[in-house]
């Protein structure tokens, strides 16, 4: 049984080797680059492959080559699988697995951390200190979490964990989800619609998957519903927000500040070291220039605990498919 791991990062390699030592009957090889039409032939002779989130594959040749090579499974080292073309997957008889839950705490903790950074104006404080300005001024006056209403949009494992953390800090927590979780009724109040939540929340945090019905759910119309001076935290998917509309709301002051960890065009820069001027996306560059935006590059998942869980789950799912023809974490 053989598995080839494409796009293996230096922080993943020790975990891959650890998993391999615990599964002597499985040969796991590492290839540092993402899978492309030029290198997909390296999968020949392997039963399964593993890819990561920046490996966008929409070329029919890649899927045909995987099928001809005898590959049975594409095991994604991600929760979201929007980088995969499922019509082509199904046409070629391949199975895709994901890692639906690797560490809800990792992403939830970043969401809460960044919310607190927004409320306490940490970036502005740092700027003032770097300028030698140590005064207590109205511009730096912060807000306590216990004084606000937090709107959690999406209450799956990550959203639920975020809600619990915000509640622990004393916030009034409201939520919207198409499928409410009654187990959370003691810590939050569900609203009947997204609009109802947006009207009441001082800060919203996004934790929904990117689907046809959720794409650009935060747009000029929904932003207009929100309180003046509200905050937005997005550690979900970049496509949940219409970036241009958000920029306009930030410039007008309708939205006071935003902490963004995911972006619709993040494939242009994720996990790359770029030279000045190399990143030319005008909306990304605008966000980077705005003092009221905290910009992180899809780091929500990036903890040692989460990386180990991701690698272990991905490789174990690949083995499950190879042995049984399906897997618990199968997504097609």
Swiss-Prot record:
Per its UniProt record, what Pfam families does this chain match? 2-Hacid_dh, 2-Hacid_dh_C
Q: Which UniProt keywords apply?
A: NAD, Oxidoreductase
Which branch of life, at top level? Answer: Bacteria
Q: Could you say which residues form the signal peptide?
A: none
Q: Which InterPro entries match?
A: D-isomer_2_OHA_DH_cat_dom, D-isomer_DH_CS, D-isomer_DH_CS1, D-isomer_DH_NAD-bd, NAD(P)-bd_dom_sf
Task: Please give the pathway this protein is involved in.
Answer: Amino-acid degradation; L-leucine degradation
EC number(s) from the headed UniProt entry: 1.1.1.345
| Keyword Coiled coil recorded | no
This enzyme catalyses:
a (2R)-2-hydroxycarboxylate + NAD(+) = a 2-oxocarboxylate + NADH + H(+); (2R)-hydroxy-4-methylpentanoate + NAD(+) = 4-methyl-2-oxopentanoate + NADH + H(+)
Q: GO: which molecular function terms?
A: D-lactate dehydrogenase activity; NAD binding
What is the documented function of this protein? Involved in the reductive branch of L-leucine fermentation. Catalyzes the NADH-dependent reduction of 4-methyl-2-oxopentanoate (2-oxoisocaproate) to (R)-2-hydroxy-4-methylpentanoate ((R)-2-hydroxyisocaproate). For the reverse reaction, the enzyme accepts (R)- but not (S)-2-hydroxy-4-methylpentanoate. Can also use 2-oxopentanoate, 2-oxohexanoate and phenylpyruvate but not 2-oxoisovalerate and 2-oxobutyrate. Cannot use NADPH.
Which proteins does it associate with, and in what oligomeric form? Monomer.
Family stated for the protein in its record: Belongs to the D-isomer specific 2-hydroxyacid dehydrogenase family.
**Identification of the protein by name:** D-2-hydroxyacid dehydrogenase (NAD(+))
Taxonomic lineage from the root: Bacteria, Bacillati, Bacillota, Clostridia, Peptostreptococcales
């Amino acid at each position: 049984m053989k598995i080839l791991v494409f796009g293996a990062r230096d922080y993943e390699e020790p975990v891959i080797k650890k998993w391999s030592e615990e599964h002597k009957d499985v040969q796991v090889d590492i290839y540092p680059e993402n899978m492309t039409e030029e290198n997909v032939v390296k999968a020949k002779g392997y039963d399964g492959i593993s890819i990561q989130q920046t490996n966008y594959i929409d070329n029919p040749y890649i899927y045909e080559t995987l099928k001809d090579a005898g590959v049975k499974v594409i095991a994604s080292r991600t929760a979201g699988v929007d980088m995969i073309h499922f019509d082509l997957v199904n046409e070629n008889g391949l199975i895709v697995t994901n890692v639906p839950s690797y560490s809800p705490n990792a992403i939830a903790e970043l969401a809460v951390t960044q919310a607190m950074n927004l409320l306490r104006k940490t970036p502005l404080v740092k700027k003032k200190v770097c300028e030698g300005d140590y005064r207590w001024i109205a511009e730096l006056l912060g807000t306590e979490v216990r004084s606000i209403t937090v709107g959690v949009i999406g209450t799956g494992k990550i959203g639920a964990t975020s809600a619990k953390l915000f509640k622990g800090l004393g916030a009034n927590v409201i939520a919207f989800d198409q499928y409410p979780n009654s187990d959370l009724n003691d810590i939050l109040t569900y609203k009947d619609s997204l609009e109802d939540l947006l009207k009441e929340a001082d800060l919203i945090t996004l934790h929904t998957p990117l689907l046809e019905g959720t794409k650009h759910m935060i747009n000029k119309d929904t932003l207009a519903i929100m309180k003046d001076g509200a905050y937005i935290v997005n550690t979900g998917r970049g496509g949940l927000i219409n970036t241009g509309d958000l920029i306009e709301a930030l410039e007008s002051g309708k939205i006071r500040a935003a902490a963004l960890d995911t972006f619709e065009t993040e494939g242009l820069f994720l996990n790359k070291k770029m030279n000045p001027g190399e990143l030319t996306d005008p909306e990304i560059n605008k966000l980077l220039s705005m003092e009221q935006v905290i910009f992180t590059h899809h780091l929500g998942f990036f903890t040692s605990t989460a990386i180990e869980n991701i690698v272990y789950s991905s490789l174990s799912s690949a083995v499950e498919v190879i042995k049984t023809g399906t897997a618990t974490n199968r997504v097609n």
